[in-house]
């Protein structure tokens, strides 16, 4: 794309490779080698390029404005490694130094200058992974995500976070050992505070230097792919940091943010909202995420705070209704549709995941039918209900059993992902293990039950770091996980349990092959509120099945009976109360032959002992006969 076409498509919102036009680029003009700099500041009175190569303010280089508000200059002065900024003169006459919004490298904190560095093209070795990803997709594949804050998974002795070179050596073997299919990172784009979570960004193309270099992250992703692990990154297209030296009021007027003051300001988060209806902002944001997908070979993007982009009144501050008198943010809705259209045309095999907390419908609906076109939506309703239930004293659970069963009413209204994320283990909410009811033994039993329920429930899975071994204290972003917990045998066994559970999930197609329709699940009994027991079947297209039974009460139930559709010998393949995982059972239930007898609509019954606060999963070891099979429950 030549310069004129790049400028035209930028102004029409159709330039999705903006990093090749704006920013700093090696160039040659009239036989002279140097760098061309371009920045969008349409209402600036003047823009000067300053940096190491100008002795900063001493020899500022004036830039020239074109008709679209892009300022440009070519100079031979810069060299590799030099730091630069733009000195922007506003209409008020005030001058302010600003970052380059398209910078791929930023200097180390506390500075915010862009660094001139040549981007070397990596010779990737993950071709087989990418080919498999394209061929297999992800809807009918196992997706079990380990959510990580890169700055606090592990830290060095001096308290500094691990770089991605170190995470490559430590985290990837851990992911393999724990049998996860994907790892998801909280934002890795440049943000003002190194100890923050990263959700108020300043550099949408720049890698957060706290975690090393872009090249180190490329190597990390490649090594993940070579170990059959996908990589997902959080991205924040709705709002950005209010810091003066970043994008805020870039040229002295609303540039990236909305013109209206209240729409521009996100009062609850102390941030600014992108003007998602502005063509140039659309080019900027979509180029950002395409760059991350292409440059780092990412397998998925989790779009943060989607509700904030869909509703004008989502924030706590004042707001104005739309042209129809409602609270729908039409610009945000159309932007998200367009975002997913562009990404899916280029990368149909890259997951687009919405973190969306409202009751808005069609988040994962087809764009052609008015949906937003995401592949998955976080099921926040399921997460809130299920955590409330597992925190409750079992005495009262029979009165709130609908908290467990209600999700089956809407489980396929969207393509759901079931999250136990970082948001649930901070700010006084307690860790996942600490949320569980009872003494220490029962808390671990409850956590084993909970994680098994998550694995068996339709939908893809996500678990925040530390929860896999039952960390007791809340997550603290400025400290590493409590790895010392693993000196305690209960935590060590919990870690082993999670690794085995993740392997069990990957190895059993009924748990993931049909995650998007009722064809993949059959409820046996959701009405046993008095005993707080839930049972259902997960199935494959070929009719293979797992019988999943959950006892949410601390009472062992001997001679417990449920109905099953097939006459067969059944074997227990999962029991959360085995000694090796911190329970009291020395071994599995013995194999059981089903018995003829009508149980609800089922022609056969299965009787066994159900562990206290335990989950028991059964599969057919050998079919005996195919008589009186419940219609549609299995296929020939």
Swiss-Prot record:
Its EC number is 2.4.1.18. InterPro entries: A-amylase/branching_C (IPR006048), Branching_enzy (IPR037439), GlgB (IPR006407), GlgB_N_E_set_prok (IPR044143), Glyco_hydro_13_cat_dom (IPR006047), Glyco_hydro_13_N (IPR004193), Glyco_hydro_b (IPR013780), Glycoside_hydrolase_SF (IPR017853). It is an enzyme of class 2 (transferase). Pathway: Glycan biosynthesis; glycogen biosynthesis. Transmembrane segments: none annotated. It comes from the Bacteria. SUPFAM superfamilies: (Trans)glycosidases, E set domains, Glycosyl hydrolase domain. It catalyses: Transfers a segment of a (1->4)-alpha-D-glucan chain to a primary hydroxy group in a similar glucan chain. Keywords: Carbohydrate metabolism, Glycogen biosynthesis, Glycogen metabolism, Glycosyltransferase, Transferase. The active site is at residues 304, 355. GO terms for biological process: glycogen biosynthetic process. One of its GO terms (molecular function) is 1,4-alpha-glucan branching enzyme activity. GO terms for cellular component: cytosol. Coiled coil: none annotated. Belongs to the glycosyl hydrolase 13 family. GlgB subfamily. Monomer. Catalyzes the formation of the alpha-1,6-glucosidic linkages in glycogen by scission of a 1,4-alpha-linked oligosaccharide from growing alpha-1,4-glucan chains and the subsequent attachment of the oligosaccharide to the alpha-1,6 position. This is 1,4-alpha-glucan branching enzyme GlgB. It comes from Streptococcus sanguinis (strain SK36). The lineage of its organism: Bacteria, Bacillati, Bacillota, Bacilli, Lactobacillales. The gene is glgB.
């Amino acid at each position: 794309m030549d310069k004129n076409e790049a400028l035209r498509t930028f102004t029409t919102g159709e330039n999705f490779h903006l990093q090749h036009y704006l920013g700093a680029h090696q160039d040659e003009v009239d036989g002279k080698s140097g760098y061309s700099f371009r920045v969008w500041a349409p209402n600036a009175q003047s823009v000067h390029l300053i940096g190491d190569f100008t002795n900063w303010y001493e020899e500022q280089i004036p830039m020239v404005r074109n008709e679209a508000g892009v300022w440009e200059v070519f100079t031979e002065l810069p060299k590799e490694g030099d730091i630069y900024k733009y000195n922007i003169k506003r209409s008020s006459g005030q001058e302010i130094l600003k970052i380059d919004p398209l910078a791929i490298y930023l200097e180390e904190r506390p500075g915010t200058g862009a660094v001139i560095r040549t981007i070397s093209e990596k010779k990737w070795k993950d071709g087989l992974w990418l080919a498999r990803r394209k061929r297999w997709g992800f809807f009918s594949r196992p997706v079990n995500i380990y959510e990580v804050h890169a700055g606090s998974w592990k830290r060095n002795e001096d308290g500094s976070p691990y770089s991605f070179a170190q995470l490559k050596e430590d985290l990837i073997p851990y992911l393999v050992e724990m049998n996860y299919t994907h790892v998801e990172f909280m934002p890795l784009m440049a943000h003002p505070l190194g100890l923050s979570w990263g959700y108020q960004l300043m550099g949408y193309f720049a890698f957060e230097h706290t975690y090393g270099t872009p090249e180190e992250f490329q190597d990390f992703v490649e090594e993940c792919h070579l170990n059959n692990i996908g990589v997902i990154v959080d991205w924040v297209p709705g709002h950005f940091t209010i810091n003066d030296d970043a994008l805020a009021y870039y040229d002295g007027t609303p540039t990236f943010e909305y013109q209206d003051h209240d729409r521009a300001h996100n009062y609850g988060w102390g941030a600014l909202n992108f003007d998602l209806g502005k063509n140039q902002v659309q080019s900027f944001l979509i180029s950002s995420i395409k760059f991350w997908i292409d440059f780092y070979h990412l397998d998925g993007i989790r779009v943060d705070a989607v509700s904030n982009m869909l509703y004008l009144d989502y924030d706590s501050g004042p707001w104005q209704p739309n042209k129809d008198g409602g609270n729908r943010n039409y610009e945000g809705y159309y932007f998200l549709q367009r975002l997913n259209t562009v990404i899916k045309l280029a990368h149909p095999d890259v997951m687009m995941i919405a973190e969306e907390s409202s009751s808005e419908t069609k988040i994962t609906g087809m764009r052609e039918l008015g949906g937003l076109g995401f592949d998955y939506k976080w099921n926040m309703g399921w997460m809130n209900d299920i955590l409330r239930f597992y925190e409750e004293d079992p005495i009262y659970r029979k009165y709130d059993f609908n908290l467990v069963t209600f999700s089956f009413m809407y489980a396929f209204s969207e393509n759901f992902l079931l999250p136990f994320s970082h948001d649930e283990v901070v700010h006084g909410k307690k860790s996942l293990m600490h949320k569980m009811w009872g003494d220490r033994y029962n808390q671990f039993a409850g956590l084993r039950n909970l994680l098994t329920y998550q694995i068996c429930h339709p939908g893809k899975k996500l678990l925040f770091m530390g929860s896999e071994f039952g960390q007791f204290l809340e997550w603290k972003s400025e400290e590493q996980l409590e790895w010392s917990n693993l000196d305690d045998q209960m935590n060590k066994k919990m870690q082993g349990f999670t690794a085995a559970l993740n392997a069990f999930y990957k190895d059993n197609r009924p748990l993931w092959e049909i995650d998007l329709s009722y064809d993949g699940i059959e409820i046996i009994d959701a009405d046993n509120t008095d005993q707080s027991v839930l049972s259902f079947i997960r199935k494959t297209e070929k009719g293979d099945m797992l019988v999943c039974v959950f006892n949410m009460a601390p009472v062992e139930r001997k001679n417990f009976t449920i109905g099953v559709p097939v006459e067969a010998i059944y074997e227990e393949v999962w029991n959360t109360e085995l000694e090796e995982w911190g329970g009291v059972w020395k071994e599995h239930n013995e194999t059981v032959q089903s018995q003829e007898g009508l149980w609800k609509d089922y022609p056969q019954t299965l009787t066994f002992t159900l562990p206290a606060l335990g989950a028991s999963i059964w599969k057919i070891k050998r079919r005996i006969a195919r008589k009186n099979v419940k219609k549609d429950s299995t296929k020939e």
